Amino acid sequence: SETMCYAKWTQVSMHLTNGKTHSCYHPPTHDIDLEELKTNPTALHNTKEKKEQRAQMLAGERPEGCSYCWRIEDVGGRSDRVYRSGEYWAQNAREEIAEAGADGDINPRYVEVNFNQACNLKCSYCSPHLSTTWEKEIKEFGAYDIVDGEHNNLDSLSKQRLLPTKLAQNENPYVTAFWKWWPELYKNLEVFRMTGGEPLMDSNTFKILDYVYKNPNAWLEMSATSNMCPPKPVLMNMFIEKLQRLEEIQIWEDPEKFNPNSGNNWYV
């Protein structure tokens, strides 16, 4: 099909800090309905907006949010829609996609989750909504004046609903819904990525590692986006200890910060 994209069914990025989701990095994120979550935790992925877009795709129409791919295809290029639909984890779910159709709920095979904004670094390419250290600096010194406006302006981020909800972690309804869904979601999961914030500063990361250890999944590819230098050495030691119990895990690190002499040659 010229309008079908398997990612709309099989892939999800969940931003549990602010209750937003999308099924690809090109479309904008949209809000997760809290009322729907109370009875259906899969609404972290299977939102009304996504179901409407799935219906459009099945009807041969082009969802507006996927305009990045449409523009590429309109000039004869091969877009990410084609690549994402051809991924092994997407192809493995073809029967489930057909069964779910536009309105049914489906468990994605590729999941990326952001549990927490907490981070001890303030990398120049990052933002206050993804780093508590960045947020603290902007609150103290204000946004950065640049040629066409202000960089990392908190008011602007707040209006875009990018800043995390001001709730304690144990009161976050999006995190609560995730853990309700997790045992069922995990069964056919093939790719799982934890981002942040800094994942090693969040208890959910270690809870995930313990669950995976107790419930082995031979098909699972798991990774974490980490700066590899949490503020407390005990966190790194605990992370290494849990990694050593798992068969394979990927650590996504900024290559510019990689120190070949650090001795940390046990990770990829």
Regions found by a protein language model. Name each.
Residues 1-87:
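Accessory C-terminal segments flanking Radical SAM cores
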Residues 6-23, 100-129, 190-193:
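N-terminal pre-triad scaffold of radical SAM enzymes
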Residues 29, 33-57, 80-83, 93-100, ...:
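Membrane-proximal envelope and lipid/glycan-remodeling enzymes
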Residues 47-51, 55, 91-102, 171-183, ...:
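A Trp-anchored, charged/polar loop motif used as the substrate-binding/catalytic surface
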Residues 70-74, 126-132:
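Detector for the c-type heme attachment site
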Residues 76-109, 119-121, 142:
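Recognition helices and adjacent regulatory flanks at domain boundaries
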Residues 108-118, 129-173, 186-203, 215-237, ...:
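Core AdoMet radical
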